[in-house]
Every structure is written in C-alpha cells, then in structure tokens.
Amino acid sequence: MKKRIKELTDLLNRYRYDYYTKDAPSVSDSDYDKLYRELVTLEQSYPEYVLQDSPTQQVGGTILKGFEKYRHQYPLFSLQDAFSREELDAFDKRVKAEFPNATYLAELKIDGLSISLSYENGFLQVGATRGDGNIGENITENIKKIKDIPHQLSEPLTITVRGEAYMSRQSFKAINEARQENGETEFANPRNAAAGTLRQLDTSVVAKRQLATFLYQEASPTARNQQNEVLAELADLGFSVNPYYQLTSSMDEIWDFIKTIEAKRDQLAYDIDGVVIKVNSLAMQEELGFTVKAPRWAIAYKFPAEEKEAEILSVDWTVGRTGVVTPTANLTPVQLAGTTVSRATLHNVDYIAEKDIRIGDTVIVYKAGDIIPAVLNVVMSKRNQQEVMLIPKLCPSCGSELVHFEDEVALRCINPLCPSLIQRSLEHFASRDAMNITGLGPAIVEKLFLAGFVHDVADIYQLTKEDFMQLDGIKEKSADKLLAAIEASKSNSAEKLLFGLGIRHIGSKVSRLILEVYGDISALLTAKEEEIARIDGLGSTIAQSLTQYFEQKTAAILVDELKTAGVNMHYSGQKVNSDAALFGLTVVLTGKLNQLNRNEAKDKLEALGAKVTGSVSKKTDLVIAGSDAGSKLEKAKSLGIRIEDEDWLRKL
C-alpha cells in the first residue's frame, strides 16, 4: 500500500503540474477524480503512509486562531513607479551610465498580493505576506490551499521565492454572484477578494476560492546569472510563471511591449496594472543596489488610470495628523476601476487654484496609482455660472487661523491642541505600520478623545477596562481584546514606536535605518543633526526634522511617560554602532570575489556601518576590488580613492 500511495501521489501531482503550470491538461477530469478518490481511500486506511506533498492535503480546511508575525530573511522592497516614456528613458540612462551593455526583462505587473515562499530540502516550510517588507504574516496553511503552489519542489532545494497571489476574473465573478445570492457584501475587485481570502482563518474558504499565483524571483542566493534564467528555473521547479515577457536592450522595444500588453489587457484572465522592467543581469542588479525604498535596477511602469466624468456637489476640509488641511470633493457617484466612487481628493489649495476647480463643476475623476480617487481637471465646456471656491481661513476642527507657508502647497493648522490633529495622531500611532494596536481604529479613538480619556499617545497605555466599558457600543469582551492589543504593542521593536510618533519626514523605513544606528529611542534625545545626516539613505532634511522634534521638552516628557508605561524603547534588529570600523563610509564592491560571495561581502560591510553603492564617484570613500576588476577600479585610482582587497575585508 505504501508503494501505491507514493505512485498515486506522484502521478496526481504531475497531472496538477500539467494543468496549473503548463496550462496543458494531460488527463480527463473524470480520470483524475477516479485516481484522487483511490488515494483518499488508501490514505484513510493507512494514515501512516500519507506523504507531505499529497494533493489531498490541499483539500478541506482547518480553523486558524490567527496569524503570527514573520520576519523575512530577505526583505521585500517596493518598486519605483513610472507613468511616462520619459521616466523610463531616465531609468535607462541611469542604468546605461553604469552598464552600457545592460539588457532588460519586461514582465507583467500582476495586480495581486505579494507572497514569499520558503522551502527547505524541497519542502514548503513558510508562506508569508509582504507586510512592511521586513515583517509579514505567516499564512502557510492558507498558502497550502492554493493549488498551483507546490508543497514539494522537483529538486531538494533550500530556497526562498517571491511572487503574486491573485484571483482570476472568472473566479471573482463566481464568488460575487454567490455572495449576492447569500445577501453578503460583494468584493470591490479581484485584488481585494484575494487579500480577504489570504487572511481567512478558515482554510477551507481559501481552498474554495481558487486563488492562483505567478512566481518571479529567487530572493535567496541563486546560481542563475540572468533574470530570464530565474524564470526558467522557477518553472522547472514546478511554479507557475507568467508567459508574457520581453528580453531586450532597447527601450523602444520595451515601449512597444508595454503598448502591446496594454492593448490586450482586458483579454487576460487576470488583472494587471502595469509592466515591470528589470535589469536582466543579476550581477548588475547587485552592483546597482537599492535606495531606502526600492531597487535601482527595476522600475514599474503603471498603466494610465481609467477616467470618468462626475459633478462636484460639495467640498469637505479635514485636518491630518501633521496639521495639513486637505480638501475632498463629494461627487455624483461613478463606477471607476471596479468600485463606486463618490469622493475624490483635491490635494491642496494650490491645486484648486491651478485647475480653477469650483463647486458644481463637471470634472474628470481617476484613481491615482489605481488606488486613491482624485480630480484630474475641469471639463470647461460644461461650466455654467459656478463661482470661485471659497477657501477656509479658519481650521474646520478648532477654529484657529490657518497658515499657508510660502514653501508649501497646503493650508496648515498649527494649533497643537487641535482636536482633529490629536485624533489623527492617535490613529496613526495605533495603525498597523506603527504600533499595530488591533481594534483601536478611528471610531474608537474618537470616542476615547471626546470622553476625555486620551490626549496624547502615552494616555493610551493608561486606559483601563472601565474606561472602555463607558464607551457606547463597547462590551466586556471587546474591552478585553483592546487592552490585550495595547499590552502586546509594548513589546514592539522601537522603529515601530518612532514611526508612530508621527515626526515629519520620518517614515517606517527611515525609522528602522535610524534605530539600526542608535539602537534606542532615548538615544535620539541627544543625537546630533550631523550624525543623523550621515546615515545611509537619510540626509539633512530628515536629520533636521528629527533633532527639532527631540529638542522639545514635550518630547522628553512623552518618551519618559511611554518608558514608565513599559513601552519598549530598544531596537530588536541588528544594531550598527557609530564607532563601527566603516561607519558612515561609502563603499563600492567591484570585480570577482573568491572567498565571499557578493551578498556576504555586502552584509559584512553594512554590519560594519558602511553604505554599499554600485558606482564610483567623488563621494566614494573606499573600493573593495576583487580579481578582474575593471573600469570602477580605474576610476577609483584616478580619483585617489582608497582601495583594499578581499583579504583586507575578511580580516576586519
């Protein structure tokens, strides 16, 4: 029986691969079902012989208690967006300045959810969401319910791969029809449906919804030399790989490919929102490296957004957490990119003046980045007698006089006691990318603020069960969950806290970079502006904003209150000391390394405090030259830059 179970498992997995990966079924559905039922019967009789990669392990489901956080061994970066041919040409110029012979691989940008899959000795161990790029959620049990993801690879590799999980248009239509019949709210679009599916606690729901994937990257070190070779290897290993891509050195050919794909976009079985262009050589990718947010070797061209006409009925003015007052237009409802849109941002007062936008105007509405509804311009031919829009002089929340700084496009409320400003700051502090206090959303924050229970973020950690129970609609169970979420947030790594403070110009990635150096929030109270500016990826604007914030007496008081409440002040990741051997130095790796691979060398340099870049310039402090080093070594010599070899690096 053991042998027959193994035969059936291998046979059914091969049929599944032919169907889902090759899109070439090699057996009829009835024959497949007959073999499948035989395997189910045998496994029920001999459970000790059930194999880890059995197709039966993808059927049915369990109820999960929740999703654990998962720290990615290899961070997931965002991509730089482009919306024009000129931006693509600028990208090409930057790349060709370093590598004149560079070729590109253009791939479809699938409108789905980024996933990371880790295998050990060929077996799937972890499936995770992207999260913030460093920490995602472990959704392995749900990932196993996606039929085209292999539980076992065709080779016993230890590897981490990346891709997109998506829902086909056909599956999306069927699911929404079923939800409509059951009186349930329909999903807005396939991407939202896929996102909701992957976060289901009932894995049987995931199995029924028929998600699919396209894999496109080996995140772990690979023996391949080119991106197109990576795609071929992924397909050989049993993954689904998108068949549409273009390999070329010509941006003209890339542009032709983009236009061809855009023309057939509606004919595809799944949603796409653009084309990703990557430098094909993995060695060149390593040399080009990354900015704080994105790789320098790739760019994502986004298709132009769908546009519709709508009438502006009125305008709301709201105060954000930094005091910026944002105008939002209330519109006659229109269908846009799969959703009903009745509100759209007008950005700021300068934008309103530039476009001469007035209440009652017919305007062109689109979704910026296919996400945020915005007003593009006015249809002047349909204007009647609309009057110029009145711009508020007083804050809509606190009544304080608004200011319009010369170097800014927005109106701003500068009253630190403005109720809206405080509430938005509290919401930001509790948000997922900051302290991630589950359940503490805008509605509850507003109730807490109006009840007088919270005035700053430190007050959150003084809340009691009785406080929550006094709020309308909060029962004992909800109060317990909120208190548990608040307590859990105390143990977050310090970069979450720093981001949560809402300091201007200090985003989540910048927060991590700062804490990698300083290690503790308390150390920022005495940090020097020039020291902060030296950190790789930052600069004077960020350094000035950070030091100005922590120079305030209120900042020291707030940090002390948070510390007293038990909120963690320490960075839990790898810290780079300011006295590290290469702290603050800009270093370039060039040539072939014989004892370290390039990733190992880069990791060591960064651990020693260096900024590793891909090109030699006057700003370069040090070049590590391996064998066969070429033009970069010559340029370093001509500029008088210090040069060391691999042995020197290994001894550090």
Curated annotation (Swiss-Prot):
Stored SMART domains: BRCT, HhH1, LIGANc
Ligand binding (NAD(+)): D29, S30, D31, Y32, D33, S78, L79, E107, R130, E164, K278, K302
Entry-linked InterPro entries: BRCT_dom, BRCT_dom_sf, DisA/LigA_HHH, DNA_ligase, DNA_ligase_AS, DNA_ligase_CS, DNAligase_adenylation, DNAligase_N
GO process terms (BP): DNA repair; DNA replication
Cofactors (names): Mg(2+); Mn(2+)
Residues noted as binding Zn(2+) in the record, renumbered to the chain: C395, C398, C413, C418
Superkingdom of the source species: Bacteria
EC number per UniProt: 6.5.1.2
Keywords: DNA damage, DNA repair, DNA replication, Ligase, Magnesium, Manganese, Metal-binding, NAD, Zinc
Role description: DNA ligase that catalyzes the formation of phosphodiester linkages between 5'-phosphoryl and 3'-hydroxyl groups in double-stranded DNA using NAD as a coenzyme and as the energy source for the reaction. It is essential for DNA replication and repair of damaged DNA.
Family assignment from sequence similarity: Belongs to the NAD-dependent DNA ligase family. LigA subfamily.
Name of the protein this chain belongs to: DNA ligase
